[in-house]
Amino acid sequence: MLKGSSSTSFLLPQQFVEPLPHAPVEISALHYGLLSRNDVHRLSVLPCRRVVGDVKEYGVNDARLGVCDRLSICETCGLNSIECVGHPGHIDLEAPVFHLGFFTTVLRICRTICKRCSHVLLDDTEIDYYKRRLSSSSLEPLQRTMLIKTIQTDAYKTRVCLKCGGLNGVVRRVRPMRLVHEKYHVEPRRGEGPRENPGGFFDAELRTACAYNKVVGECREFVHDFLDPVRVRQLFLAVPPGEVILLGLAPGVSPTDLLMTTLLVPPVPVRPRGCAGTTTVRDDDLTAQYNDILVSTDTMQDGSLDATRYTETWEMLQMRAARLLDSSLPGFPPNVRTSDLKSYAQRLKSKHGRFRCNLSGKRVDYSGRSVISPDPNLDVDELAVPLHVARVLTYPQRVFKANHELMRRLVRNGPHVHPGATTVYLAQEGSKKSLKNERDRHRLAARLAVGDIVERHVMNGDLVLFNRQPSLHRVSMMAHRARVLPFRTFRFNECCCAPYNADFDGDEMNVHFVQTEKARAEALQLMSTARNIISAKNGEPIIACTQDFLAAAYLVTSRDVFFDRGEFSQMVSHWLGPVTQFRLPIPAILKPVELWTGKQLFELIVRPSPEVDVLLSFEAPTKFYTRKGKHDCAEEGYVAFLDSCFISGRLDKKLLGGGAKDGLFARLHTIAGGGYTARVMSRIAQFTSRYLTNYGFSLGLGDVAPTPELNKQKAAVLARSVEVCDGLIKSAKTGRMIPLPGLTVKQSLEARLNTELSKVRDECGTAAVQTLSIHNNTPLIMVQSGSKGSALNIAQMMACVGQQTVSGKRILDAFQDRSLPHFHRFEEAPAARGFVANSFYSGLSPTEFFFHTMAGREGLVDTAVKTAETGYIYRRLMKAMENLSVRYDGTVRNTKGDVIQLRFGEDGLDPQLMEGNSGTPLNLEQEWLSVRAAYARWVVGLLAGSKTASDGNAIRDNENYFNEFISMLPTEGPSFVEACLNGDQEALKVCEEQESREDALHNSNGKTNDRESRPRTGRLRRAVLISHLVKVCSRKFKDDIQDFFVKKVREQQRIRNLLNLPNTSRERTEGGGDNSGPIANKRTKKRAPSLKVKDSKEGGRVSELRDLEMLQTELLPLTRGMVTRFIAQCASKYLRKACEPGTPCGAIAAQSVGEPSTQMTLRTFHFAGVASMSITQGVPRLVEVINANRNIATPVVTAPVLLMEGEENHCEIFRKRARFVKAQIERVLLREVVSEIVEVCSDTEFYLRVHLNMSVITKLHLPINAITVRQRILAAAGHTMSPLRMLNEDCIEVFSLDTLAVYPHFQDARWVHFSLRRILGLLPDVVVGGIGGINRAMISSNGTEVLAEGAELRAVMNLWGVDSTRVVCNHVAVVERVLGIEAARRVIVDEIQNILKAYSLSIDVRHVYLLADLMTQRGVVLGITRYGIQKMNFNVLTMASFERTTDHLYNAAATQRVDRDLSVSDSIIVGKPVPLGTTSFDLLLDGSISNDILPPQRCVKRGMGPNFHTAKRHHLVPLAAEGVFRLDLF
C-alpha cells in the first residue's frame, strides 16, 4: 500500500496558472505498509463470491466495481468509464494462506520467535538493547535491515526459550509454500538443556504417539512439526506488542498481516475484458485467477469434505493465491507454473512492465517522427519541419494586444492552411471551439478577445525539441528553431550529426513541440543547440564541421588560392545573411589586379565588419605540422589568428572538427559565446557546401591507380618481407629461435611475423601517399583535411591490404591444421595465414577475399555482442548516479542530503567549461596570446593618440613609460608573479599604483572613451580581481600559472642572451652589456648612427640599451601591466567556470562514462611496454571495475625498481636490478631448477636425492640454493591441507649448496616405497622461489618496472629493490584490502581512464572522480550492481524501477519503509518535477515592490515579478542573502 502525504502545487500545463480551490496535490513522501483485514474491508464496496453463468452481481465483474465500456454506468458513483476509475472489492478466504511475497519474511520470523510462547528467542538484556537501537531516529533503512539480520542470527542460535523453556529447532522451507519445525533434530547450542514441557501442543501429540508406538520415541529427531498458516497465525497473534519491532515490523503492526486472509479485488477498469478473436470476448488474466480462488474458497466452505480433500483444496487455494501474485511461481515445480498468465508481478517488472514502460517512461503528445536528411543551407540551430507535421502539432498561444491580429488571421486560416489554428479556447465562456467549419472560423475570429487561447500551428522560429534514440547523453535531445518547409523529412545542418550520432541512411528522429512558456524558456536557455556546442563530457566541441565542410575549408585556406572582386563577392553572398553587415577587407594583392585570398574569406566569416567586437587571437598546430618553423611551415601546418586576422596555416579537422579544444570554434566559443559560434559555423557550412559544388570534388578509380614506380617499390617490399618471414619460420622449425620473454617459440614466431607484416603495409602506404599530389588528388585531400579516411585506406586501395587478424592474431589453422584447404598442413607462410598482398585496386584472390571477410565478420559480431552489455552498463550507471547534484554550499549530495563530494571534481569547476586538454580550467598559452594582443592594441592606441611625433617621442623617452612598459628582468618576474598569487599587499599596491599611472598616461592623450581604454565603471580593477583569485582559486591552478611564467622567463632569458641584455637590476643600473650578442651586433651595425645618445633641445633620444630593451619587450612583453592583466583575466575566467548549483552532475557523469563504452570492443590488449603480456581491456575490463569484482581476469602488479641517488641515468644498473626484482617475484617450481631427483634405496635408508641445476639458477639470477629449497619445502609442508604435511625438519637434510635429501616420514620397509613414490610425485611442484601467487613476471621495455601477473600486492611491496611507495595493482579489491579505501578509489579512477585511453577516448577526470567517490562513500567498495545499489540506501521506487521490482516492494511493505526525500526516479514515477536544475530552488515574489511594476492581481496571476531570489526547498532566504536573481519583464 502507498500512503501519500501531499502539499499544494500547481502543475497544470498552462502558461499562466491561477490558484484553484481544488488544486492537484503533490506527493512529498511515500509510506509503504501492509493492508490489514479491516483496511481491506474499509476500502471495499462489496464482498465478491462465486457466480455461475451470466450473473454478475457480487461477482468479480459486478458493475459496482466499475465499468470498462463507454456505454455502461458505474453503479457505485454513477459515472461513465472515462470519469470513473473503479472501486475495489474483496474476497474473504475460508482459511488463511501464506503470502508469496512475504513468505521469506514469515520464515525468518518463525525462526526468531519461540514456537510455544511466541517470545523472541533473546534474553531481556539483548531485547532492551536492540529495542533502543531500532527506536533511534537516525537509523537508516540499510542499517535497520542489517540490525534485524543480526537479531535473527542471534535468535536462530537459541535452542531453548529463555521465557518458557520450550525447545526450538530449525524451521525449514519444504515444498514451495510449506514450513516445518525440526524440533528435536539439533542438539542445544545456546541456553540450558530441554526442560519438561507438558503444555506444548506438539509435545502432547508426541507423547501420545510414543505411548502407542515406542519406535516413534526412538526416532524422535526425525519427527517434524508442520507449521501450516493457521498455526503460524496463532503464533503471530501471541507475539507481545513490545517485541514486534524486533521482528522488523513497525510498532503497532501485527505480524498476522503478513498472511492472506482477505484478498482485495481491483476495480474492473484495471482488468478490462478483451477480444480473443473476431467475436469472442475473454476475461483478463487477473479476473480468471480471482474466479479460480473463488472456486477453491467455495469448495472449502462445503461441509461434506473429508480431511484429505479439505487439505488438498487448501493447498490448491494456496497455489492459486500465489499464482495471482506471480505466475512464474519461483520454487514451484514446472508443471504448476503458468508463465503465459500475466499476474501482478508480470505486470510490474521487466522492460515492458508498469515501472519501466509506463511510469519511468511515458508516451507523450505533441510529437512527431520522420526520416532525417541533411540541409547545409539551414543554420546550425534550425530544423526543417515538414509542412504536414507543422499542421498537426499545435501550441496554445494566449491572445494579447500585440498578437491580436495575427491570431485572428490564424483562426481564419483554420486547420488546413498553414499558418493556421485548430481550436480556440474562449476564456469568457470557458469552452473550446473547433475550427473545422469554415463559417465558424470567421465568427470566432471576430469574437477573439485578449485572454483567449488559440491552438496554432508550428511557425517559423518556434522552439522544438529534436531527439534521436538511443539517447545516450544529454545532447541526444536539443532545442532547434523550426523552419516550416515542404516535403516529408526532418532536415538539419550536418554539423549537428555528432551529438545525435546520426547518419542519413534511413535514420528516424523525433520532434517534440513544447507547450508552455516555462518549457520554452528552459529549452532556450538549457537545451538550445548554441548552448551545447561544447560537450559536458570533456569540454570539447561536439557540434562542429564535418566531411565536405572540412575538405572545402582545407582547399580554400591553402596557399596560392586567390579570388578577384567578383568571385570574392560571390563567395561572400553564399553565407551573407539578410541583416549581416560586412565590409570587404583590403585585397592581399593590389596590382596588377585586386585579389583576395581564401584566408581573407575566413577572416570575413569570423568578423564580417570592424563593428563586430570579436577579436580572435590564437595559435594551434594542425595534424600534419612538421615542427620546422611555425608561420613558415612548408605544409602550412601551423594556424595563427591575431585580432581575427588569419595569419598563417591551413584549416583542417583539428581546427574545425569536433574534439578540438585548440580549434577555431572552441576559442570562438570562449571569447564570443555559443550564439556567435553557431552563426560562424552556419556561415562556414553554407559557404563550403556551395564552394565545393562549384569547385567539383569527386573520387574515381583514376585517383587511386598505382603508378609503375609504386608497383616496383611494393614488389621490392614484399620480396624483402617474404624473405624475412621465411627466415623466421625456418629458425623456429630448426629450434634456433630465441623465444621472447614469457612466450613460447610458437608465440614468439607469431609476434615477430605480425610485426614484420605490419611494416609491409605501412611502408607500402607511405610510398603510395608520396606518389599522390595534394593539389588534385581527392582521396589525399580528404585524408589531409580529416574529412574522411586515413592514410591506411589509401594504402589498402592502392598498394596492399595487409595482414588480416582475428582477436589480434593471424588467421588460425582451424581446418585440419591449416587455415583453408588450399594450403598445406602446418604451413606458416604469410599467404597461408591471412596476409593479403593485393590491393583493392588490383583485386583480391579467392583466399584473400575469404580472409578479409573473416576479419570483417569479427567487427560485426563484436558490435552485436557488446550492444546489450554496454546498454546495461549505461543503465546501471544512470540509476546509481541520477540523484547526485551540486548544492548551493558547493557540495555534491544525493536527494537524501548525503555528502558524496565536498567539491565537485575536487575543485568545483564545470567540466564543460574546461579549456585545457588535460582538464585544466584555462589554456594559458592561448590566454597569453589573447592578452598580449589586447595589450599591444592598448599600447599602440596610447602611442597613436599623441597629436604630433614629438609627443610620441616624449612618451617613449618618459622614464615612467620605460619603467612601466618595458619587460621586467628575469630575476624580477617570478617573484612578482608569486607575490601577486599569494596575495602580497605590496604587490597589490604596486598593481593599483601602476593602474593609476596607466590611466593618467592614457587619459592625457584623450583616449578615455576608446574601446581599449581602462576598465569602465562597474568593472573590477585588476588588483581586486587578483586578491579575489588568491581566495577562491585552487592551489593547483595558481601553481599552473606560476609554472607558466617560469617557462616564459626562460624564454625571456634566451632572448636577452641573444640581445646581450642584462638579466639583473644591478647590471641594468650600471648599463651592463657589451652589445656583443649576435642580434645586438646586427642591430648596431645597421642602426648605429641613430642609436647614439645625443643632447638636443627635445631632450635627447633613447640609448642603444633602451632600444634593445624595447625590442625584447616587443618579442616577449613580460611587463608588470601585461602580467597583471593576464592574471586578472585568468582570475575572472576561473570564477566563471564554477559548477552552478543544481547541476545534475551525477547524470552527466554517468552519461559521460556510459556513452563512450559503446565505442569499445570486447578484445584484450597488450600491456603498455610489454608486448607479450595481454590484459583485459575494453568492455570486459570496464565491467570488472564498475562491478567491483573480487576476481578479475588478468590481475597485474606493477613494481617500479627502487632508484638510488645518482642512478637515474644508468640504464644497465636499472636492468640488473630489474632482473633481480623479477627473480624475487616470479614463481619458480622445483622442477624448473632441478637437474635430477634420484631415488636412493639401501639396506639402511631410503630417501630422494635432489640435485639443483646451478647453471640455470645463476643465469636467471635466482636466489635459490639447497638451504632455501629446504625452507620452502618445510613451509609448504606446514599447511594443514598440504599433501606434504607428513614431512618435518628431520625429513630433509642438506648435503651441499646444490644437493639435499628428502626422507620419508617413516622407514618401514613395507610402506617406504609407496611413500617415496608419493613424495616424488609432489616434490617437483613445490614453489622454491618467488611468490606463489604470481605465475609470471616481465620487465618493461624501458627496464624501470617489473610487471607481475597476479594479485600478490602485499608480498611484492615487501621485496627489496622495489619502490613500495609507487607499486600499483589493477585489482581494486586487493588494493582496498592492503592499502585502504582511498587507494582503491585512486585505482578506480586510473583504471577507468586507462580503459578509455586505450581507445583514444577522453572524458574529464571529474566525472570519474564522482563515480569513484560514489562507489567508495561508505568505506567499502560497492559495485554498480543490483546488490551495490541496494547498499547505497536508495529509495524503494528507485530500486523497484531498476531490478527485482516485487522483492523491493514486498520488503518495503514488510518493514513499513518511509521515503520522505523523493529521488529522481521517484519524482518521475509519481509525476513530480525532479529535484534538480531549475527545480532545486524557488522563485519568490517580493510583494513589497511588485505593485510598482504590475497590478497585484496580474502579479499573482502570472506567478512572476521583477525581483526574485533563490530559496532552498521549504526554506526562505532573505532578499539580502547571496544568490539574488533578477528577472526583467519584457
Swiss-Prot record:
Binding-site residues for Zn(2+) 2, renumbered to this chain: 114, 117, 161
First-listed, main subcellular location of the protein, grouped into a coarse class: nucleus
InterPro entries in alphabetical order: RNA_pol_asu, RNA_pol_N, RNA_pol_Rpb1_1, RNA_pol_Rpb1_3, RNA_pol_Rpb1_3_sf, RNA_pol_Rpb1_4, RNA_pol_Rpb1_5, RNA_pol_Rpb1_clamp_domain
Compartments it resides in: Nucleus
GO molecular function terms attached to this record: DNA binding; DNA-directed RNA polymerase activity; metal ion binding
Comp. bias intervals (Basic and acidic residues): 992-1001
Record's keyword terms, sorted: DNA-directed RNA polymerase, Magnesium, Metal-binding, Nucleotidyltransferase, Nucleus, Transcription, Transferase, Zinc
GO BP terms: DNA-templated transcription
Keyword flag Metal-binding: yes
PANTHER family, sorted: DNA-DIRECTED RNA POLYMERASE SUBUNIT BETA' N-TERMINAL SECTION
Subunit and partners: Component of the RNA polymerase III (Pol III) complex consisting of 17 subunits.
Listed name of the protein: DNA-directed RNA polymerase III subunit RPC1
Upper taxonomic lineage: Eukaryota, Discoba, Euglenozoa, Kinetoplastea, Metakinetoplastina
